[in-house]
Amino acid sequence: FMFDLKNGSLPQVSYIITPIELSEHPPYTPNDGAWIQSHVANSLMKSQYWNRTVMIMNYDETGGFADHVMSPLSPKGTDGEWMEDPFDHKLGQQPVGPGYRVPFYVVSPWTRKGGVFTEIASHDSCILFLEKWSAAHGKNWTSKELNPWRRKHMSDLMSVFDFSKRDMSVPRLPHVSKAVSYTHLTLPTN
């Protein structure tokens, strides 16, 4: 991503999966993940792509059972949302999602609200957003992996944005010291 960004060859959609040392998983620290997020966001905001880019930083998992908010469930038996427990058939049908809340944030010229997004979303929401974005650019497609219940009940993230106002100023992000667990990493800068 960083090399494509610097060389002006960034594709229309990119996924960044960090090395384990920058994942915030133990034994690594939140600072390690914050460093790479800050580096990517700052590099993007200073690049030629800033005026037409949306960066969604989506964690891959939750805080688990510590979350005080119950996850939404589809009605029992909803196709694609319930399955028989593979380890204990006596338990019968069990929900498979959407699961506990997962943190994410969006950085773009169209997201300056500084608020908290409260719609029900899941990892599927990023796919729903990409479908909407693609359709707006004349490239209609639909992910067949999403069932009708998720399409109806999960956010497509469109309300995160105000596309009538584009603020090209570069927000100042907090300083994050370099990840100590990954000091051998050399990334290009703008």
What is each residue range found by the language model?
Residues I16-E24, K76-W133:
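Substrate-binding rim/cap in mid-to-C-terminal beta-strand-loop elements of soluble/periplasmic
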Residues F1-Q37, A41:
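Anion-binding catalytic surfaces of enzymes that hydrolyze or transfer phosphate/sulfate esters
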Residues H39-W82:
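Metal-dependent active-site segment of extracytoplasmic phospho-/sulfohydrolases and closely related
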Residues S9-V13, Y49-M55, R101-V102:
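Loop/turn elements at helix/coil->beta-strand transitions in domains of secreted/extracellular proteins
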Residues L22-N31, A41, H89-Q94, W110-A121, ...:
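Active-site rim elements
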Residues T183-T189:
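Conserved small/polar residues in nucleotide/adenosyl-binding loops
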Residues Q12-T18, Q37, V54-T62, L130:
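Beta-strand elements within well-structured catalytic alpha/beta cores of enzymes
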Residues D32-H39, S43, E61-G64, R101, ...:
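Extracytoplasmic/secreted proteins, especially bacterial periplasmic and envelope-associated proteins
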